[in-house]
Amino acid sequence: FQGSMETQMTLMKMTDVVCDDLKARIGIDRAKGTYPGYHYMRLTLGEFIRHRYKVRDLAFGQLTEQFIHDYQAFAMEEKGYAIDTVRHHLAILKKICRLAYKKGYAEKCHFQHFALPKQSERTPRALSRESFEKIRDVEIPAYRKSHMLARDLFLFACYTGVSYADAVSITNENLYTDDNGALWLKYRRKKNEHRASVKLLPEALALLEKYKDETRETLFPIIHHPNMKRHMKALAALAGIKDDLCYHQARHSFASLITLEAGVPIETISRMLGHSDISTTQVYARVSPKKLFEDMDKFIEATKDFQLVL
């Protein structure tokens, strides 16, 4: 296991081997949808090593048990990934280390006893109409500019379904005008590279205009994710919302409150959110009791003149 970093098999090199092997097997014995998770794990792992160790790669002999704990914290706190995404990244890391040991590139099977975090059992929920209006209308002191920006980013996500990672990276190049003069937001999601397209509501356009700045490349100023979580907590307190408030709820609220309740087909919502599988959208777009009652009333009205024929 001696030798320079150029000649020995290292963590990032082994990660490349695993990712390239998976990519080559797509369509043979691996589905296309499995690759993005590995690809983004590789990007996050490389970023973590550069951030934490100030180098581009590590030898397997340099790894300690603390490494995987620090990587988990980086993915959750710095990158803001959901627990299920972090769990998937950690599982891939363990697989890479297990393969390196099996092939003789590592003297030990690193992280074999590390327990993966439990999958989230709590389904993220959309805001109620009442909570949404409280956040929209809450008065924020002028000196709380960061709170104001956090609230407006949250509202923009409610109106567009844009995730946090995408909201702070979209630029004017992502804005398109259609033949009818309507403005659209089109982008590739950071999480999986899937295309997302959504027509901008007047409320979303107003927020873009509010933060328009020719000297800045992105459409909105950037708030780092740990700060965003802190602002969300403060925003909930200001608005008088007792439940926890997280940015991702805005994406669910777009699916349920803004689009599904307005009669938008779930297939269209899926395209707007950039989902590859409509079953994912079905988790986001939950029918509210209000929507259920309205649909039942429509059904009863439409069938009131029907006669049962036996």
Label for each model-derived stretch:
Residues 2-42:
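Short, aromatic/basic-rich helix-turn unit that serves as a nucleic-acid recognition element
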Residues 155, 159-166, 234, 251-276, ...:
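C-terminal catalytic core of tyrosine-transesterase DNA break-rejoin enzymes
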Residues 299-310:
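C-terminal secondary-structure termini that scaffold catalytic or DNA-interacting sites
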Residues 83, 87-89, 106-164, 214, ...:
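Basic, Lys/Arg- and aromatic-enriched nucleic-acid-binding interface segment
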Residues 190-209, 213-234, 246:
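C-terminal catalytic core of Y-nucleophile DNA break-rejoin enzymes
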Residues 115-116, 121, 125, 129, ...:
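Conserved tyrosine-mediated DNA breakage-rejoining catalytic core shared by Y-recombinases
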Residues 33, 40-51, 58, 77-112, ...:
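N-terminal DNA-binding recognition helix of tyrosine site-specific recombinases/integrases
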Residues 126, 189-193, 205, 225, ...:
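Catalytic-site neighborhood detector that most strongly recognizes the C-terminal catalytic loop/helix
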